[in-house]
Design a protein with these regions (language model features):
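Flexible helix-coil transition and linker loops at the boundaries of alpha-helical arrays
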Residues: 28-37, 67-77, 98-103, 133-138, ...
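"A position-specific structural signal for the A-helix of alpha-solenoid helical repeats
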Residues: 6, 42-44, 77-81, 111, ...
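Single-residue signature of alpha-solenoid repeat helices
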Residues: 20, 58, 92-96, 125, ...
């Protein structure tokens, strides 16, 4: 019996399910008493790996175990697998909790965590999974994968990525590969481009010789998003074009592919080309994804100088009450209205952006409005706030730094040290051919002369 069970455990770990099921069915037919009960429990566990597709088989195995050992009904693993199956069938939470029992059995705890996940209780599942569980190899990696799913459902992308990465370390073959792909996806969501690319590189040796176009498209999509995070739009464009090619070869068209295509083109400074990509993304997307794609399209119109189209597209976004970036949308609308010369509306939109948390965009427009009225003190205050709130290197941050220096210069080169420090901070983000590059250099040089120093720019 022990030899047969070892064969089953190894087969399950290696993904050789035919051998595992054949051995279990044969063992269950020949065994009696506790041996039959143990075989039935392991058979039920094996069926449980198939999710909904394994419900009937798992229930049948549990029933066969009861025939051999009627007292099996009180066994923690029996009750945990039964609870998992009931949760998977959609039973009420209260009914499932009555089945589950307090236990320290690692197998039982794993299946309880699965049941809790099926009930939509990832926090409770994590309380179970974060305990040290000594599980056989075929369940050990799955416990970490389940941990990753729980963190993912809770919106904790970095923690999910770490769990999937650990699962990949313990898994073999395609399961090793898929956990690395999941880890890469979560690293991307966490904004960790380097770690995402590293996970993709680790998955490379496990890519099937005849890779499904769908899987290849996913891989190239993640590579493109990783490169965008790392500020490599050219490499991102290469990768996303490969993903689009895989869609033409049969992969399911996803809204994210043209969306990332457009984002790469935007970073490369080609907003007009990006418009077509974002239009395609809008056509493919639904619900909040569609609103996000519309927002990207509006920004592309804005950058292309097509202000009327930008405004109408953005107002469509703002009609979605569930959209999670309303503050940013109001900030972009404020810029559009400012550039259209509708200053009162621009001011209202900017204040609404600030109220909704998009501080840098709102203060930037309010600074521009104050500057136009020659209210330079007020303008400087807004630009300073915008530069503090915007992420360093972002479009808003660069613009706020430029305008703060320019305003200080208009105020008679007040605070020359600040002119120098702001100029030194922003110059690395500007192309030498950018007219602001020379302007800031000139301002900084004059400020240094005023304080009699010999500081040089980086």
């Amino acid at each position: 019996m022990m030899g047969a069970m070892q064969v089953v455990l190894e087969a399950l770990h290696q993904g050789d399910y035919d051998t595992a099921f054949e051995t279990l069915v044969r063992t269950l037919a020949l065994a009696q008493g506790q041996d039959a009960a143990e075989a039935a429990l392991l058979l039920a566990e094996a069926y449980s790996l198939y999710g909904e597709g394994g419900i009937e088989g798992a229930n049948r195995a549990l029933e066969e175990g009861l025939v051999s050992v009627p007292t099996l009904e009180s066994h923690p693993r029996y009750r945990s697998i039964l609870g998992e199956m009931r949760a998977l069938e959609g039973a009420p939470e209260e009914d499932v909790r009555q089945i589950l029992t307090k236990t320290s059995d690692p197998h039982a705890l794993y299946h309880q965590a699965q049941a809790l996940m099926y009930l939509g209780l990832p926090e409770e599942a994590l309380e179970v999974l974060n305990q040290p569980l000594e599980l056989p190899a075929f369940l050990a990696w799955r416990a970490h994968t389940l941990q990753g799913k729980a963190y993912e459902r809770m919106g904790q992308a970095a923690e999910a990525a770490a769990a999937y990465k650990e699962a990949s370390r313990l898994a073999v073959g395609l399961e090793h590969y898929w956990n690395l792909i999941d880890a890469s996806a979560m690293f991307v969501e966490a904004g960790l481009g380097h770690e995402a690319l590293q996970a993709l590189r680790e998955a490379q040796p496990d890519i099937p010789e005849l890779e499904d176009p769908e899987d290849a498209a996913t891989r190239y999509y993640l590579e493109a998003r990783s490169q965008l995070l790392l500020g490599n739009p050219g490499l991102a464009l290469d990768a996303i074009q490969r993903a689009l090619e895989k869609e033409r070869e049969g992969a399911e068209p996803a809204h994210g592919t043209p969306l990332v295509h457009g984002q790469a083109l935007m970073q490369l400074g080609h907003p007009r080309e990006a418009i077509e990509a974002f239009r395609e993304a809008v056509g493919r997307a639904e619900d909040s994804d569609k609103s996000y794609a519309l927002h990207e399209l509006a920004v592309a119109y804005l950058e292309s100088g097509e202000l009327a189209e930008a405004e109408s597209t953005l107002r469509e976004v703002m009609r979605d009450p569930e959209y999670g970036y309303q503050g940013e949308a109001y900030g972009d609308l404020a810029e559009i209205l400012y550039r259209l010369g509708r200053y009162e509306e621009a001011s209202q939109a900017a204040h609404e952006a600030i109220r909704l948390g998009s501080l840098s965009a709102g203060h930037l427009i309010l600074g521009n409005l104050a500057c136009d009225l020659l209210h330079l003190e007020e303008a400087l205050e807004h630009y300073a706030l915008a530069s503090e709130e915007a992420p360093e290197g972002s479009r808003d941050w660069v613009t706020a730094q430029q305008m703060a220096v320019d305003t200080l210069a208009q105020l008679g080169f007040r605070r020359p040290d600040e002119i120098i420090s702001r100029s030194e901070a922003v110059l690395p983000y500007l192309h030498p051919a950018d007219e602001w590059h020379q302007t800031l250099n000139n301002y900084a040089e004059r400020a240094r002369n005023m304080i009699g120093g010999n500081r040089t720019l980086n």
